Structures are given as structure tokens and as C-alpha cells.
């Protein structure tokens, strides 16, 4: 996936500034004019503008829209995830993988699970998607990781076979098999507005889309917006820019379970949480990873606002179908306040480009991340995984029957 790299822009900027001995400063004996002071700045804006426009044009030229009406837009991810197991999944591999997640068995179209589930709501969400498939599934065993973090590093001893562990999110450093998160149905981040987690993607699709109609593009505030806890300092530059340029950015930290003092919200009192629907009044919405991939990401597109996605490392099963500069604006980790300011300002000054990207992002998520697409991916995953199981599955008496 493409990503913008500001270093080259900054080099152009420094090179332009370095063409005069005085570094662009007006010396005491000179007659200072408004033109002399503004020309370098205008040139710098032009250089950055041209780079962004080129990136958008190149991305659109290479983009082939997915025309499918089912989950096939995402199936390349499934093929890639299952490729390490093309020679088959053995009982030995399952036993080695057992400590990395919750063990499930499907035998005779019945489902069994180990008694202790670390996160009951997460297990329940996973089981919701598996249950409708039971009548057509072969016998199999699954190790499903419901933790935030993936488990199977690709950097382990090269002679060691990868283990078949299913996780909702990962980076390229991991070989876990991705599944659509439990959070499409229940669970997910729990905050005061959503005490049991975001959950119910089908319902949020309707409610956020309704809010987007209340806030069409021409009525949205020309501000970048973010609310969330300080799970990493990657979010700090946007919050700091908000304090310097509140008319440009409204970004504030909220409390999380670990909050103890204003130090945990970058030396400010924590802000109130904001409903997903209320995000829609802003033109520019920022998404940051949390501990792993962000549950917020998919919801932001439904506002028909321009999504700025910080960092390309973390993935969910549907991320690969979203293309940078086509559906969202990619933002590198480590960007500073100055660079953020200029990036946001570019889209304020190129409103049509911003709206076009926002609309493409909305259409893609609305048409290709429906609840039926999530269910379809689960079905394809389970059936293809089941075909790889190369042993007779025998009932583990330590497991309890779920369905």
C-alpha cells in the first residue's frame, strides 16, 4: 500500500530556502515587501500541493474497483493467510498452537469449546458467526485468539512450522490467520457511551449513515476531528496541533481505564467521549491504531467525511481492499504538527478532491463491508480451513458443548 513520505517534501522546502544567503529573512538595510516575504511560502505550498495531487492521480490510475456483490473483494487476504498451511493442518500443529488461544472443536456439526474463555463477550461474538455454518462444516479443531495481539511471529526459527492460530488483526510480522472480529456483533472497546462495547455493526451502519445525511459535505465543519484515549504517543502531534490551531483541529484525549491524572491526557483535563454519529459534523476524521487495529476505522467512512488513517502497519481482513489516496488519506507514523497542519490545509484548499476521496471511501465500505460480507468471509474461512485439516478429529472431553 502506498503511503506519503514527507521527507522528500521537506528536502524540497529546505533546498528552496537555501537559495538565498539570508535564508529567506529580510535584512535590515533591505526594503521589505509583502511579496518578498510571501513568495517562498507560496512556492513551498505549491511543491507540497503538487506532490499530493500526483499521489492521488497515480493511485487512481492504478486502482481497479471491486465490482463484486459478495465478500470476494477480501478473499486475496484469506488466500495469503492460508498459504503457509497448504500442505495441511495436523493434530501436532494444533497441540503446539493450543496455548495461543481458545480451543474449539466442531464434530458432527456440533461445537465444543474449552471451559475457560478469557474474554466471554469476545468468544460469544466469534461463536455467533460460526454457529450458522455448523450444518455444512466438516469436523475440525480451531485455535482462536481473542486477545488484542497476534501470536505467531514470522521471525521465529525458520525451521519451525507456522502454527494455525486465528486472530482478528496482525502486522506483516505475523502469520496468524485473520478472521472478522467479534466486534462486528458484540464486544469491542467499552467506553461510557458504549459500556458493553461498540458491537452491532449492522445497527451502526444505519445510525451513522442517517447522521451523515444530516451533515452533508457542504454543511460539515472544516475541522479535523479526533476523540480517543492516549494509547500511544502517535496521537500527540494532532492533539498538540489542536491546542495551537483550534480553528483547524479539534483533537482531545479522553479517559481510559489506566487514567490517573491529567498527565495521562497530555497535561490536560480529559475530554468527554463523542458518539460515532456526532463525528459526522466534521469534514476530516482521524483514525489511529490502538493496541492493535482500530475498531473505529470502518465507522468513520460512514460519515462521508474524509478519513485520515495514521500508520499502515496494522491490518484487519478488509483493510487491503481499501486503497490509500483512493478511499482515505494515508498519514505516516511520526508526522509532526507542522506537517499535519499543511496536510489538512491542502485538503481545505482542494475541497473537491477531499469530497471525492470521502465519497469513494463511503461507497466502498457501504457496498463491500455489509454484515453479509462479514458472514460470507467467516463461511469461506471455515470451509477452506476445514479442507486443510488432515486428521480425524476426536472429542476432547475437557471441552464443553456450546451448540
Swiss-Prot record:
Class of the enzyme per the UniProt entry, highest EC level: transferase
Site residues by UniProt (Interaction with the consensus sequence C-X-S-X-[PA]-C in peptide substrates): 119, 230, 257
Signal peptide positions (record): 1-20
Molecular function as annotated in GO: UDP-glucosyltransferase activity; UDP-xylosyltransferase activity
Compartments in which it is found: Endoplasmic reticulum lumen; Secreted
Pfam families associated with the record: Glyco_transf_90
Record key words, sorted: Disulfide bond, Endoplasmic reticulum, Glycoprotein, Glycosyltransferase, Secreted, Signal, Transferase
Gene Ontology terms: biological process: positive regulation of Notch signaling pathway; protein O-linked glycosylation via serine
Residues annotated as binding UDP-alpha-D-glucose: 227-231, 235, 274-276, 292-296
Disulfide bridge map: 66-73, 71-376, 117-123, 280-303
Active-site feature positions: 148 (proton donor/acceptor)
Keyword Ion transport: no
Glycosylation sites: 70, 157
Gene Ontology terms: cellular component: endoplasmic reticulum lumen; extracellular region
Pathway membership: Protein modification; protein glycosylation
Region annotated Interaction with the consensus sequence C-X-S-X-[PA]-C in peptide substrates, chain positions: 190-195
Keyword Zinc: no
EC numbers for this chain: 2.4.1.-
Purpose: Protein O-glucosyltransferase. Catalyzes the reaction that attaches glucose through an O-glycosidic linkage to a conserved serine residue found in the consensus sequence C-X-S-X-[PA]-C in epidermal growth factor-like repeats. Regulates Notch signaling by glucosylating Notch in the ER, glucosylation is required for the correct folding and cleavage of Notch.
Family according to the record: Belongs to the glycosyltransferase 90 family.
Name of the protein: O-glucosyltransferase rumi homolog
Amino acid at each position: 500500500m502506498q503511503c506519503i513520505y514527507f521527507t522528500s517534501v521537506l528536502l524540497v522546502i529546505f533546498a528552496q530556502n537555501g537559495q538565498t544567503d539570508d535564508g529567506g529573512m529580510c535584512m535590515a538595510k533591505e526594503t521589505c515587501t509583502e511579496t518578498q516575504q510571501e513568495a517562498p511560502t507560496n512556492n513551498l505550498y505549491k511543491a507540497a500541493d503538487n506532490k499530493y495531487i500526483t499521489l492521488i492521480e497515480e493511485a487512481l490510475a492504478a486502482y481497479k474497483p471491486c465490482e463484486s456483490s459478495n465478500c470476494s473483494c477480501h478473499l486475496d487476504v484469506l488466500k495469503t493467510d492460508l498459504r503457509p498451511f497448504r500442505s495441511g493442518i495436523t493434530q501436532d500443529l494444533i497441540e503446539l498452537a493450543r496455548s495461543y488461544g481458545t480451543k474449539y472443536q466442531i464434530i458432527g456439526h456440533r461445537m465444543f469449546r474449552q471451559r475457560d474463555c478469557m474474554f466471554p463477550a469476545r468468544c460469544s461474538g466469534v461463536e455467533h458467526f460460526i454457529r450458522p455454518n455448523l450444518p455444512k462444516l466438516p469436523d475440525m479443531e480451531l485455535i482462536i485468539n481473542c486477545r488484542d495481539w497476534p501470536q505467531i511471529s514470522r521471525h521465529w526459527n525458520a525451521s519451525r512450522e507456522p502454527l494455525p492460530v486465528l486472530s482478528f488483526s496482525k502486522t506483516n510480522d505475523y502469520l496468524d490467520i485473520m478472521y472478522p472480529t467479534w466486534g462486528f456483533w458484540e464486544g469491542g472497546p467499552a467506553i461510557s457511551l458504549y459500556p458493553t462495547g461498540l458491537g452491532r455493526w449492522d445497527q451502526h451502519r444505519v445510525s451513522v449513515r442517517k447522521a451523515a445525511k444530516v451533515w452533508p459535505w457542504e454543511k460539515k465543519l472544516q475541522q479535523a476531528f479526533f476523540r480517543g484515549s492516549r494509547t500511544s504517543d502517535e496521537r500527540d502531534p494532532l492533539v498538540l496541533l489542536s491546542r495551537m490551531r483550534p480553528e483547524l483541529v479539534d483533537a482531545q484525549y479522553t479517559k481510559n481505564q489506566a487514567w490517573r491524572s491529567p498527565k495521562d491526557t497530555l497535561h490536560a483535563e480529559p475530554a468527554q467521549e463523542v458518539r460515532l454519529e456526532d463525528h459526522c459534523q466534521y469534514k476530516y476524521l482521524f483514525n489511529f491504531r490502538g493496541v492493535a487495529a482500530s475498531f473505529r476505522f470502518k465507522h468513520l467512512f460512514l460519515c462521508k467525511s474524509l478519513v485520515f488513517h495514521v500508520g499502515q502497519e496494522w491490518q484487519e481482513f478488509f483493510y487491503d481492499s481499501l486503497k490509500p489516496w483512493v478511499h482515505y488519506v494515508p498519514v505516516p507514523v511520526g508526522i509532526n504538527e507542522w506537517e499535519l497542519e499543511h496536510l489538512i490545509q491542502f485538503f481545505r484548499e482542494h475541497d473537491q478532491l477531499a469530497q471525492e476521496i470521502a465519497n469513494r471511501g463511503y461507497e466502498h465500505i457501504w457496498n463491500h463491508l455489509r454484515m453479509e460480507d462479514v458472514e460470507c468471509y467467516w463461511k469461506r474461512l471455515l470451509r477452506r480451513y476445514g479442507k486443510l485439516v488432515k486428521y480425524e478429529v476426536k472429542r476432547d472431553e475437557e471441552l464443553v458443548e456450546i451448540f
